[in-house]
Regions:
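Catalytic histidine-centered segment of alpha/beta-hydrolase-like enzymes
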Residues: 133-146
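Flexible "cap/lid" subdomain of the alpha/beta-hydrolase fold that forms the substrate-access gate
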Residues: 1-129, 150-157
Length: 158
Protein backbone atom coordinates (compact mmCIF):
# COMPACT_ATOMS: atom_id res chain seq x y z
CA UNK A 1 0.00 0.00 0.00
CA UNK A 2 1.22 3.46 -0.77
CA UNK A 3 -0.15 6.41 1.22
CA UNK A 4 -3.58 4.82 1.80
CA UNK A 5 -4.34 3.02 5.06
CA UNK A 6 -6.63 0.03 5.42
CA UNK A 7 -10.24 1.28 5.00
CA UNK A 8 -11.19 0.25 8.54
CA UNK A 9 -8.21 2.09 10.01
CA UNK A 10 -9.13 5.12 7.93
CA UNK A 11 -12.78 5.03 9.02
CA UNK A 12 -11.77 4.73 12.66
CA UNK A 13 -9.39 7.68 12.28
CA UNK A 14 -12.24 9.74 10.83
CA UNK A 15 -14.09 9.15 14.11
CA UNK A 16 -11.21 9.29 16.60
CA UNK A 17 -8.57 11.61 15.13
CA UNK A 18 -9.78 15.23 15.31
CA UNK A 19 -7.48 16.15 12.39
CA UNK A 20 -8.46 13.38 9.96
CA UNK A 21 -11.80 14.85 8.78
CA UNK A 22 -10.03 18.10 7.84
CA UNK A 23 -7.23 16.20 6.12
CA UNK A 24 -9.84 14.35 4.07
CA UNK A 25 -12.21 17.25 3.36
CA UNK A 26 -11.49 17.03 -0.37
CA UNK A 27 -13.09 13.55 -0.42
CA UNK A 28 -16.53 15.12 0.04
CA UNK A 29 -16.29 17.91 -2.48
CA UNK A 30 -14.86 15.54 -5.10
CA UNK A 31 -18.28 13.84 -5.02
CA UNK A 32 -19.81 16.92 -6.66
CA UNK A 33 -20.81 16.11 -10.27
CA UNK A 34 -18.86 19.17 -11.47
CA UNK A 35 -15.67 18.23 -9.58
CA UNK A 36 -13.83 17.33 -12.80
CA UNK A 37 -14.39 20.79 -14.20
CA UNK A 38 -13.38 22.46 -10.93
CA UNK A 39 -10.07 20.61 -10.55
CA UNK A 40 -9.19 21.14 -14.21
CA UNK A 41 -10.18 24.84 -14.32
CA UNK A 42 -7.47 27.43 -14.96
CA UNK A 43 -5.02 24.93 -16.45
CA UNK A 44 -5.64 22.44 -13.62
CA UNK A 45 -4.76 25.03 -10.98
CA UNK A 46 -6.17 22.95 -8.09
CA UNK A 47 -4.20 19.85 -9.12
CA UNK A 48 -1.00 21.81 -9.71
CA UNK A 49 -1.28 23.67 -6.40
CA UNK A 50 -1.97 20.48 -4.47
CA UNK A 51 0.98 18.64 -6.01
CA UNK A 52 3.33 21.61 -5.58
CA UNK A 53 2.29 21.94 -1.93
CA UNK A 54 3.36 18.31 -1.55
CA UNK A 55 6.74 19.03 -3.18
CA UNK A 56 6.07 16.95 -6.28
CA UNK A 57 8.64 17.86 -8.96
CA UNK A 58 7.32 19.94 -11.88
CA UNK A 59 8.25 17.23 -14.40
CA UNK A 60 6.13 14.72 -12.47
CA UNK A 61 3.22 17.18 -12.30
CA UNK A 62 3.32 17.59 -16.07
CA UNK A 63 3.50 13.83 -16.54
CA UNK A 64 0.46 13.31 -14.29
CA UNK A 65 -1.49 15.98 -16.13
CA UNK A 66 -0.56 14.48 -19.50
CA UNK A 67 -2.59 11.47 -18.36
CA UNK A 68 -5.37 12.89 -16.15
CA UNK A 69 -5.49 16.47 -17.44
CA UNK A 70 -8.67 15.94 -19.47
CA UNK A 71 -12.26 15.56 -18.32
CA UNK A 72 -12.79 11.82 -19.09
CA UNK A 73 -9.54 10.78 -17.41
CA UNK A 74 -10.16 13.04 -14.42
CA UNK A 75 -13.68 11.62 -14.10
CA UNK A 76 -12.16 8.15 -13.94
CA UNK A 77 -9.63 9.27 -11.31
CA UNK A 78 -12.32 10.94 -9.21
CA UNK A 79 -14.38 7.76 -9.59
CA UNK A 80 -12.21 6.26 -6.81
CA UNK A 81 -13.68 8.77 -4.34
CA UNK A 82 -17.19 8.27 -5.66
CA UNK A 83 -16.93 4.48 -5.41
CA UNK A 84 -16.20 4.76 -1.69
CA UNK A 85 -19.84 5.81 -1.18
CA UNK A 86 -21.06 2.47 -2.50
CA UNK A 87 -22.01 0.06 0.24
CA UNK A 88 -20.23 -3.26 0.02
CA UNK A 89 -19.99 -6.26 2.28
CA UNK A 90 -18.00 -5.42 5.40
CA UNK A 91 -14.28 -5.30 4.77
CA UNK A 92 -12.30 -7.52 7.05
CA UNK A 93 -8.61 -7.88 7.60
CA UNK A 94 -6.17 -8.19 4.72
CA UNK A 95 -4.82 -11.74 4.41
CA UNK A 96 -1.87 -11.16 2.09
CA UNK A 97 1.65 -9.98 2.94
CA UNK A 98 1.44 -6.21 3.06
CA UNK A 99 3.94 -3.38 2.84
CA UNK A 100 2.53 0.02 3.78
CA UNK A 101 4.68 2.98 2.74
CA UNK A 102 3.50 6.26 4.27
CA UNK A 103 5.10 9.69 4.44
CA UNK A 104 4.87 11.29 7.86
CA UNK A 105 4.28 14.68 6.23
CA UNK A 106 1.22 13.34 4.37
CA UNK A 107 -1.42 16.07 4.44
CA UNK A 108 -4.35 13.70 3.79
CA UNK A 109 -3.59 10.61 5.90
CA UNK A 110 -2.70 11.16 9.54
CA UNK A 111 -0.53 9.07 11.82
CA UNK A 112 -3.49 7.47 13.63
CA UNK A 113 -4.88 6.05 10.37
CA UNK A 114 -1.46 5.00 9.15
CA UNK A 115 -0.34 3.29 12.35
CA UNK A 116 -3.80 1.79 12.88
CA UNK A 117 -3.52 -0.19 9.65
CA UNK A 118 -1.44 -2.88 11.40
CA UNK A 119 -4.53 -4.01 13.34
CA UNK A 120 -6.26 -4.93 10.09
CA UNK A 121 -3.52 -7.00 8.47
CA UNK A 122 -3.66 -10.74 9.23
CA UNK A 123 -0.48 -11.60 7.34
CA UNK A 124 3.17 -10.55 7.37
CA UNK A 125 3.14 -6.76 7.62
CA UNK A 126 5.77 -4.09 7.23
CA UNK A 127 5.10 -0.44 8.01
CA UNK A 128 7.62 1.82 6.28
CA UNK A 129 7.14 5.45 7.35
CA UNK A 130 9.18 7.98 5.41
CA UNK A 131 10.33 11.02 7.39
CA UNK A 132 9.44 14.37 5.87
CA UNK A 133 7.66 12.83 2.87
CA UNK A 134 4.12 13.76 1.81
CA UNK A 135 1.20 11.99 0.16
CA UNK A 136 2.95 11.57 -3.20
CA UNK A 137 5.93 9.56 -1.99
CA UNK A 138 6.55 7.83 -5.32
CA UNK A 139 7.05 11.23 -6.96
CA UNK A 140 8.98 12.80 -4.10
CA UNK A 141 11.39 10.00 -3.21
CA UNK A 142 11.07 7.22 -5.79
CA UNK A 143 14.13 5.33 -4.56
CA UNK A 144 12.78 5.29 -0.99
CA UNK A 145 9.59 3.75 -2.33
CA UNK A 146 11.06 1.29 -4.82
CA UNK A 147 13.72 -0.13 -2.49
CA UNK A 148 11.35 -1.46 0.21
CA UNK A 149 8.83 -2.42 -2.48
CA UNK A 150 11.36 -4.57 -4.35
CA UNK A 151 12.51 -6.13 -1.08
CA UNK A 152 8.90 -6.93 -0.16
CA UNK A 153 8.22 -8.49 -3.56
CA UNK A 154 11.39 -10.58 -3.29
CA UNK A 155 10.21 -11.92 0.09
CA UNK A 156 6.67 -12.52 -1.14
CA UNK A 157 6.74 -13.40 -4.86
CA UNK A 158 3.39 -13.35 -6.59
Amino acid sequence: MLSRPHPLAFNRALREDPEQPTRSAHHKWLLDPSAEDKVLADDAHWVRARLRRNRVPEAAIEKHLSVIGNRPAMAAAIGWYRARRTRHAPIGPTHVPTLFIWGDADDTVGRIAAEGTAEFIAAPYTFAPLAGVGHYAADQVPEQVSTPMLAHLALHPV
